[in-house]
Amino acid sequence: MLEVVNIPLESLNLSTILPMAVVIAGALVILGIDLFTKNSSRSFYTMLSVIFIVLDLGAVLYFEGYSRGFFDFMLIDGISILSQFIILIASALFIPLALTSKRFHEFSYPEYYALFLFMIAGFQFMVSSDHLILIFVGLETASLALYTLIAMHNRQSAFEAAIKYFTMGALAAGFFTFGSMLLYVASGTLELNVMAEVLVERDFQPSWLVFAGFVFLCSAIGFKISLVPFHTWTPDVYEGTNSVLAGYMSVVPKIAGFIVAMRFFDIFLASEIEWVRNLLYFLTILTITLPNIMALVQEDVKRMLAYSSISHAGFALAAIMINTTQSTSALFLYWILFLFTNLGAFTMLWVSRSKINHWNHRYDHPYERFSGMARIMPVGAILMGIFMLSLAGVPPFAVFWGKMYLMSSALNSGFIVLALIMAVNSAISAYYYLKLIIYMFLKEPQKSNERDVFMKNATMPLRTIIGLSASVVILSVFFVDRLLDFILKYVEYSGF
């Protein structure tokens, strides 16, 4: 006869799943409202989504220090809190953009908002666990919702993008499960902190099994955060989806992937397994450099920003590879500042979107579209120029501070060559960012009567989000120290 197991409710510490429960409840409320009423506006669903995201953020910031719960599947620590903070801030900035011109019909469906909230919960589960099963559940929940959100744009290119993303996601899921299985065989556990103890005790033997498991899991993570050579899907998928969702994808799925990578790679880096550090060093250099070179030859601004985002992911991987408290703090500082810059840049692409393409019919956002933008829409050109200068790492704009602190952490840890490579690539990237600025300010407008091309979708919510993003980018010099202190406090909670 099976023995009855008595588990006190207090020991489950169910408060650890409260943030995810909030947005899941929000998604179910939206679906329930749609079931009983068919005439609710997207303004109503947008407002509901923002309310639940804000409640979720409040639940996240309620935690301090370190806690586990839900049969030890859940882990709330400093990096979990910081990453959820980034996810929710980005989501709160994204969802009001649904209040745009009526032709973006996907925002009229309540299912869009429900899927978006389910996706947020998936990302939160990913970053709030060190158990490979729950990480996988979160990964697939978020991915399946995101595939659908991309396809709901209802253009041929959006369907193609969703299929490409789904195919790569399915491959990554296969790699993740196979790698997890091999590491389970080697260690007897799927909990990363216990796995680390067991592997260290066994001196990472059997080595071939550990190596194979590492390679498969590293490949899965590489697909999700667009590391070279697993990045090839990224430009096509970003090009096919709508611009602001592409901007969101360049930030939120990647921070979730970075946290998983940080927890997993720390098993090997903390034990000073040299071949792992060398492999990550090589991937870092490759991911920073190759997309930069590819971005130089792009004819479409959106594809250029896609390759740019891959290169920025390489900077984040450098922080993970260095694996110090300073580098981990630099990663979060970098990504918070990158969030506002990149989301602002992609939103500007949407503002200048038009059904009529007078320039290059192969692309939606060729450089020629922005010719003479300073004469047609001077404020828009200045804002886009600020976002480009920030992405290039030009002081005193936001991303400069992230790059500077990250390079400082590399120098302090003895990675002098890596710091030089980051500096050189920042200089290279300035070419394609400045290229867009030259088109906007120094080229003649190709169509003198095309004022309606620009600010086509510039509703008040879009103007507000762009203005807020630009304000953070410009004024970051005044609050970056306090932001860094805030980040450092939570990183130290985690022991990184």
From Swiss-Prot:
Q: What is its main location?
A: membrane
| Subcellular location as annotated | Cell inner membrane
Reactions performed catalytically? a quinone + NADH + 5 H(+)(in) = a quinol + NAD(+) + 4 H(+)(out)
Q: Kindly state a single biological-process term from the GO annotations of this entry.
A: ATP synthesis coupled electron transport
Query: Which InterPro entries does its entry note?
Result: NADH-Q_OxRdtase_suN/2 (IPR010096), ND/Mrp_TM (IPR001750)
Task: Give the E.C. number(s).
Answer: 7.1.1.-
Origin superkingdom:
Bacteria
Subunit structure, interactors included: NDH-1 is composed of 14 different subunits. Subunits NuoA, H, J, K, L, M, N constitute the membrane sector of the complex.
The text of the family note is:
Belongs to the complex I subunit 2 family.
Give the protein name, as stated in the record. Answer: NADH-quinone oxidoreductase subunit N
